[in-house]
Amino acid sequence: MKTISLLFCLLLSGTLMAQTTVTGIFQGNADIGNPAIKGSASYNPADQSYSLKGSGYNIWFERDEFRYAFNQIEGDFILTANFRFEGQGTDPHRKTGWMIRASEDEDSPHISAVMHGDGLTVMQWRDFKGAEMKDPEDELFAKGSGYEIIQLERAGKIVFMRAAVAGKPFENIGSYAMENMPDKVLAGLFICSHNPEVTEQAAIWNVRIDKPVGDNYNASRDGAVGCRLETMNVFDGKRMVIHEKQGRFEAPNWMPDGKQLLFNMDGLLYKIPVTGGSVTQLNTGTVIRNNNDHGISFNGKLLAISSSKDDAAGRGSAVYVVKLKGGEPRLVTPETPSYWHGWHPNNKEVIYVAQRKGIPVYNIYRNSIKGGKEVALTDISEGEHVDGCEYSPDGKYIYYNGSHTGNMQLWRMNADGTGREQLTFDEYKNWFPHISPDGKWIAFISFPPDIEKNSHPSYKRVMLRLMPAGGGEPKVIAYLYGGQGTINVPSWSPDSKQIAFVSNSGK
């Protein structure tokens, strides 16, 4: 009898372990509501994607049946991912998406961002345990269809749903107050076949769970915020997290060999393989107060850095140049503040933004890496701002962001500062245009419209976008929580197919 009891306990333990096996970033993985056909969730570390298979009659009325990959989480958070059904499917109302749930009980309160097989996209909820969900009282419908990216955000008791067609900004689907949802909840991915006799499958990628901080957040007072170092193919939008830390690092450059990235952290510069692994410090001699404005010359031999100094010539950020293999940097700009942003293709000159003569306005300057008399390329008025200046690979243009029109937009001008031409015309605050090595594309970051026009703060809901170098309609290539330090400097891969950037995972 003891042997039978022990065997039963082992079998039960194995079943529970199978349901809660860690799957990628998720600790929970289970069928909810005991569907007749068991589901599964798998994670592919090669591309950091998920595959969910599941059955179930529905997620509706007073009880649910579906497959769920989830974490226990509390407080405010943002859930974002790309979704695609596999195969034609049996029922047009097969569904996948994000779900926030009070418990694993089949009749638990929940609120879900749902994408159906026929394209119907809705936010649905059950307010109370065992409550019967009703149409249309317990759902909000998206106006469009064909969405691929789904986001669900909780801020206090309010839950917001957003959705986007690939390449387009998020649309606000709606919000709902879950007054009876506990602070500690389950949050994760789900799939339901809407037919208890079949199994459906979904592919899910770019899965991110972020913990946003408040607008009054202060890092020195409130502690470190997590960072991810990511790479992304700009043409299919697929992202890879290669390094994570509960602390701040910023602004990756892609090394000329295509095999490593360079980024700043705690005043120093570090290298890491593009596939992840151990970080190694790059020697910058006595210059050890480096910020997020650094980049590599076109010939791959030199590195420009911006670092704080305090001497008779100036106090604040100055531009230096050092060999890419490391060494003691050479000062380029004795006057401060000066922030590097671009190399000339001749590898002998740099451009940077700086304030001069005590006037609180940044302008774009050019100078030889040997120092000497700098040349002002812009002369803007107080209240305006310019930043993010880079040469095109042929040296013909300088691209930059500027608030000449009253909103921060992308511009280009001739290399001598003449012929200013506006490139973006939308409501977003567009910063840091980075030109691909082949000269064909601009990758840049877009802040929300409500951000102050000359500001690029940290910890915001931002987009990375791509557009032709000659102008045209921008395409969204990434939705993330980030901002300052995400992509301040050139980060293209040598083959012009990928970029690197930093996103914030939150506290």
Where do the model's predicted regions map?
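Structural motif
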Residues: G226-R228, L269-Y270, A313-Y320, P360-Y365, ...
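Conserved beta-propeller blade repeats
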Residues: Q246-L262, I288-L303, E335-V353, S381-N401, ...
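Mid-chain, structured segments of secreted extracytoplasmic proteins
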Residues: D76-T90, T96-G97, L262-F298
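Beta-strand C-termini and the immediately following turn/loop, strongest in propeller blades
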Residues: Y217-G223, H243, P256, L261-G267, ...
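Short loop/turn segments that connect beta-strands within the blades of beta-propeller domains
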Residues: A155, V225, D257, M265-D266, ...
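Bacterial Sec-dependent N-terminal signal peptides
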Residues: M1-T20
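Multi-bladed beta-propeller domains
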Residues: R228-R248, P273-R289, V322-P337, N367-H385, ...
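Extracellular glycan-recognition regions
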Residues: Q19-N218
